[in-house]
Amino acid sequence: MRTLAVIAVLGMLILVGCQKIIFVSVENQGDCVPTFVLKTSGKVELHSFMVFETTSDGKATGTVWSIISEDGAPRNVSRIVYGIAPNGFKEANAAKPLHSGVTYNASASMPKGEGGGGVIFTVE
């Protein structure tokens, strides 16, 4: 799983050039409920966060959960538990159950295209 995360981060580095990178990792997948850890240089100014189900070749097949800042302003967030919108965020798509053995892509975005990042993970 770490190899997939590294590949995802390297891909984001190439795509965003000088934009700020949000490094996303996955912790604690107990009961198919992952916790996402977000890191960057300085504060993580998050605008939105989405989780997609993906095919084996990495193509998104549908959103399983997404959140967005309630007022459009970025929020400082370092941890997100799947299905629980942090303070200052609202669900744009209600959380669907995650399934063991299925591959997902989690994507964090800063406002106005200032940066972002993501991770590909499989629920164990």
PLM regions with names:
Residues S109-G118:
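Short acidic/polar inter-strand loop motif in beta-rich domains
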Residues M1-C18:
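Sec-dependent bacterial lipoprotein signal peptides
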Residues T55-V81:
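Aromatic (tryptophan-biased) beta-strands that constitute blades/sheets of beta-rich domains
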Residues S100-S109:
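Short, aromatic- and glycine-rich surface loops/edge beta-strands on solvent-exposed regions
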Residues L10-L13, S41, K96:
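Structural motif
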Residues T55, A85, M110:
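Acidic surface patches and DE-rich sequence motifs
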Residues P74-H99:
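Signal that preferentially marks extracellular ectodomain short beta-strand elements
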Residues C18-T61, I120-V123:
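N-terminal non-catalytic regions of secreted/periplasmic and cell-surface proteins
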